[in-house]
Amino acid sequence: MKRLISLIVCTLLMFSATGLAYNATNEVENISMDDDVPVWENGDSWRYNIAKLSFQLNQSGQQMSLDMSMTDLLIDVIGTTETSYKLAVSGNINGLFDYDDGAGTTIGGILFITRISSGEIKIRKADLAAENAYFVIKSIALVLEHPLAPIPLPIPLTITININQEIPRSLIDFPLYDGKEGIIPETNIDANIRVESFVLKILHSLIHDFPEEIYVEQNVTLPMLMYTATEEQVSVEAGNYTAYNIDFFEGILGSIYYAPAVGNYIKAVAEINTMDIMLDVKAQLKDTTYR
């Protein structure tokens, strides 16, 4: 469970400063020689779609998986100070989940009605590093596989996520230029996730295999990342852009695409597959108010 939470936290941070943009003329934007940190203003917003966000974990007999998509994930700049931005986050989530503890208990089902009801992220102006984040996710999970099978159980859930980055770091090493190479240093993240439901409390009183609530608190180490930034023409849902393909470990861990014309990412692709862990992310820009 802790390693699955680690993957979720890392993915949230990948998108924590992500914005997706709209180009009304669908024309290719040009990049200057060096592109520095963009300036955001109150009211700037970005919207994007995550076509795929999948996790699978096999460890010590336990098997866990989460297969999601997110539509209209909206990020708004709602506050600024001399040193930071305050972002609001909202969006809808669809997906499937499955858990097998390896000892005979299996729980699985559908995230039927799920949304990020509230979310805030603090971003450092100097480099767009995420300092901390807070999310509240409301869900009605239709549990299809459980100790009471074959009776489906609709369970309302409230999921609260807190993330603090010990030494904030950005996935973009500004200023950018074509052919730039470098290293993003490792850092630590303190994260806690709480899953609550009155139905879980009732079921726990009847069946001890059901947890009363789920709470995970963990310090996650994000490793050092070697990257290369290459200028490319990139086509996404919003249009065509000249962007930097920032790939990590020569693309082995995936890439993020940053377009100076929109002041943010326009695309993210990650696919990690080992014997124990699988992570698959595909996201792209939809629209923005940024100019």
Where do the language-model regions lie?
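Positively charged n-region of N-terminal signal peptides that target proteins for export
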Residues: 1-4, 9
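Boundary at the C-terminal end of the N-terminal hydrophobic targeting segment
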Residues: 19-23
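Acidic, serine/threonine-rich low-complexity disordered tracts
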Residues: 25-178, 186-291
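Hydrophobic core
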Residues: 12-17
